[in-house]
């Protein structure tokens, strides 16, 4: 994506797909995290090599099931987790070589990796740049030690203190940070102090999202046992609604509820999820969507390596799913193209009728088949999306 002053209008794209790879190990399991991940301390994972072999095996099996993938082109690869920066760079390199040998790959292939602060270093970024990784996202969440302790996150003070210095001197230009707000015990001003510290560095991508309480996490058990409290919803709504204007002043485009980018620096991979493009999900706990079918892998690394059924798929249900993803976008998109491509006639009529009602209420603009939310829709978003699918 080139930097441009014109806003990108998202549209249906038919000849590409993305690859997501889940590396399930972390230094420590955070209390609020509901991704499949296991805390294993500072050392490497015992099964790292066999896990990478299983990734290749899974890709091959899924391609045998969907041979048409060979006619598409991979334009995004995303190493997520867990903490993929915990894995050896050479293993990512071999995996990328494998993909290049098996598939058509776009010339401007986006290759992203999530990095945790404890792994970040100038040397690591050099290594990544050498193997073609061209996008790095660091899960910071907060720089406040009290907040990190509340979240049960590993905190390496030296690394947290030097991370902006490292990122602003990165050989990889497309770098971003995740920050979280609404952490109990922290004030609104704590979040803004983190944000302004990071804004000064001018990184091209920021994900700013609220803490949520997910079932099955340590955090949810602690809330149930009255050891911790729920996320601060009032603070969250206040920050959520203030952010678009503030970020715009700093030159960022608000392209998804929680995501801001300098022009041309949007995450092409994450846009696939919101624009209903196909992707292979590889690794334990990963999900994929290919040729109108979804699948999910076992949330257990050894079970995944022993036996992952690669012939079990559920058909997608675009009449309801499309709204859940597409209408999270706050940048403009060609809504008529999307609904004509994915929905049956009666759902198309329902979508169009509802969108016109939203326009009358001043919640969105529509023109020449292009849809864009207005800020007024933000706090109502969940209900609005629900209203289009029921
Ligand atoms: S580091 Fe990330 S993936 Fe790992 S437990 Fe924490 S939030 Fe989850």
Label every PLM stretch briefly.
Residues 1-20, 69-72, 380, 386:
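N-terminal [4Fe-4S]-dependent radical SAM core
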Residues 9, 14-16, 35-65, 73-345:
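C-terminal scaffold of the Radical SAM
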Residues 22-37:
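Local cysteine-cluster metal-coordination motifs and their immediate loop/turn environment
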Residues 26, 204, 278, 368-370:
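Beta-strand-connecting loop/turn residues
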Residues 345-359:
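Short amphipathic alpha-helical interaction segments
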Residues 359-369:
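A short, conserved structural fragment
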Residues 368-384:
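Accessory beta->alpha helical hairpin/"wing" motif in late/C-terminal subdomains of nucleic-acid enzymes
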